[in-house]
Structure formats: structure tokens, C-alpha cells
A protein has these predicted regions:
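Long, hydrophobic, well-ordered secondary-structure blocks that form the structural core
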Residues: 1-16
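C-terminal catalytic domain of Rieske-type non-heme iron oxygenases
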Residues: 13-235
């Protein structure tokens, strides 16, 4: 009786497009998230980037997915874990901006290192920007470099296993080995090593959570706030 009805329909998900990239959401969004970044990223012309299969990577990490996100959002470790990246970035000019469902980290280049050619109307005009690192809750990371875009998709497998998909979209192939985005494989493996060590250390009897750095861990704090709000609704 009354079959089929609207109750039998397949579920429709909200879909949006920004500069050739398609996004699907299981929840209704008040406004497209990219509207907040028009001034920052519109000049890039991402729709003209070329998908480069040589930059495709699939990583399996022996750690919880939230530790991977923590590490991505925390600039504190750069001088200690990433010597090559630290050589390209002016650490004193590394900044973090938070918003409702994400975090933007901005890395300035050291003198002589490759940086974006920013238009005069850009909010960062006058600065030597080496990279923009954008995280959208819960598991999307967009890394913008002068050569193009590297996307990280973080997929939880189990409490102690995480899959990370790397995808690359190239604007200028001559710059792929230059600056902050010049050796992503090395940076990724350095990150994985420290993430797995942190995961193991959290099982120690003497482990206790530390305090947040007010200048280097604003992104981590924002991530934890989002997670906490979700848990509060479930209780």
C-alpha cells in the first residue's frame, strides 16, 4: 500500500562547487563554506589546475585520526620535526586563524624563497606568503602552494588506524620542487613518525593532557572545541 512513497526515496545530499571542486554534505549548510575565503583564494584559479596522478599517495598510519588532525593544526612542532620545511618558512610570521568549522594557517616565506604573486587587492598583499594550509572539519585539508594544490583526506579506519589520501592539482609544474611545498613526501613521513609515537605514548600511565599554546595551538584548541560540542549534544 502506498508504495513507493517519499519515505522510500533515496536520500538527497547537499552538493556545492567551488572553482571546479565538488563538495557533498550530509547536513544542510547555512552558507557555502568557501564564501568565507573568496578574498583569500579566488585569485588562484583552481578550476584551471591539472590533476597530477604522480602526486597521488595513500598512507596507512598506526594512530588515531584525531592525532593526525591535531598535528596538522599545530604549528609548534615545525622547527623540531621539519627542518627542510623550516628552512623555507619564516617561523616568526606563521599565523593561525580560526572560524566556525575550520582553521587557516598562513606560512610566510623566508627571504629568497618562493612565494605567491598576490594581487594588490589581496588581504595579504605585501607579505611573502609561502603556503596556505586550510582545514575544514572534520577531515579535509587543502594545502595551497605557488605550484598548485595538495589535498589530504583523512579517513578513520579504527581507533588506532588512519588512512590518509593525498591528491595533487598542479598550476605550475616548474615550481613543484620549490619552497614550502617542494618536498611533501619528506614532510608527510616526518609527521607520520611523530604522530605514531604520540599515539603510543598516550597509553603510558604517566600520560596527562597538557595546556594549549596560545600562539601556536589555536587550531588544535578550535578542533577540540568542535569535537566537544558534538559530544555535548550526544550526552
Amino acid at each position: 500500500v502506498d508504495f513507493p512513497s517519499v519515505l522510500d526515496d533515496l536520500h538527497e545530499f547537499e552538493m556545492g562547487t567551488w572553482q571546479g571542486l565538488n563538495f557533498v554534505s550530509q547536513q544542510t549548510n547555512k552558507s557555502p563554506i568557501w564564501e568565507e575565503f573568496v578574498e583569500r583564494f579566488e585569485f588562484l584559479g583552481v578550476e584551471n589546475y591539472v590533476h597530477d596522478l604522480s602526486k597521488k599517495r595513500d598512507h596507512l598510519i598506526e594512530a588515531n585520526w584525531m592525532l593526525y588532525v591535531d598535528n596538522y593544526l599545530e604549528g609548534f612542532h615545525i622547527p623540531f620535526v621539519h627542518p627542510e620545511l623550516n628552512d623555507a618558512l619564516d617561523y616568526s610570521g606563521y599565523t593561525t586563524e580560526v572560524f566556525e568549522n575550520g582553521v587557516l594557517q598562513v606560512g610566510e616565506a623566508k627571504e629568497g624563497e618562493i612565494s605567491f604573486d598576490l594581487p594588490e587587492t589581496h588581504p595579504d598583499f605585501g607579505k611573502q606568503i609561502a603556503a596556505y594550509y586550510l582545514w575544514l572539519f572534520p577531515n579535509m585539508m587543502f594545502n595551497f602552494y605557488p605550484w598548485g594544490l595538495s589535498v589530504n583526506i583523512v579517513i578513520p579506519i579504527s581507533p588506532d588506524k588512519t588512512r590518509v589520501l593525498y591528491r595533487g592539482y598542479v598550476k605550475n609544474s616548474e615550481l613543484t620542487e620549490e619552497g614550502a611545498g617542494g618536498d611533501l613526501d619528506t614532510v608527510e613521513l616526518q609527521d607520520q613518525d611523530i604522530i605514531e609515537k604520540v599515539h603510543k605514548s598516550m597509553y603510558s600511565k604517566i600520560y596527562d593532557r597538557g595546556r594549549y599554546s596560545p600562539t601556536r595551538e589555536q587550531g588544535v584548541h578550535q578542533f577540540h572545541r568542535i569535537i566537544s560540542k558534538i559530544y555535548e549534544k550526544l550526552v
